[in-house]
């Protein structure tokens, strides 16, 4: 169970880092938002899901 928690935290950190870089790039490009809207929404949905997963796994470990 600890391995799953550590992998979930790593995935959350990696997703946060990717979104931290990619979202401003998408917003600053001229046609970026209209062409990459689905990618931003799916990345945000993945991030929210990982936040809940880390919270659930944390409550099971503690």
Curated annotation (Swiss-Prot):
It is a multi-pass membrane protein. The keyword Transmembrane applies. The chain crosses the membrane at residues 8-28, 41-61. Signal peptide: none annotated. GO terms for cellular component: chloroplast thylakoid membrane; photosystem II reaction center. Keywords: Chloroplast, Membrane, Photosynthesis, Photosystem II, Plastid, Reaction center, Thylakoid, Transmembrane, Transmembrane helix. It is found in: Plastid, Chloroplast thylakoid membrane. PSII is composed of 1 copy each of membrane proteins PsbA, PsbB, PsbC, PsbD, PsbE, PsbF, PsbH, PsbI, PsbJ, PsbK, PsbL, PsbM, PsbT, PsbY, PsbZ, Psb30/Ycf12, at least 3 peripheral proteins of the oxygen-evolving complex and a large number of cofactors. It forms dimeric complexes. This is Photosystem II reaction center protein Z. It comes from Populus alba (White poplar). The gene is psbZ.
């Amino acid at each position: 169970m600890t391995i799953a928690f550590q992998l979930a935290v790593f995935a959350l950190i990696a997703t946060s880092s990717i979104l931290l870089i990619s979202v401003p790039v998408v917003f600053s490009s001229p046609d970026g938002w209209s062409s990459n809207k689905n990618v931003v929404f799916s990345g945000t949905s993945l991030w929210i899901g990982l936040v809940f997963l880390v919270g659930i796994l944390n409550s099971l470990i503690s």
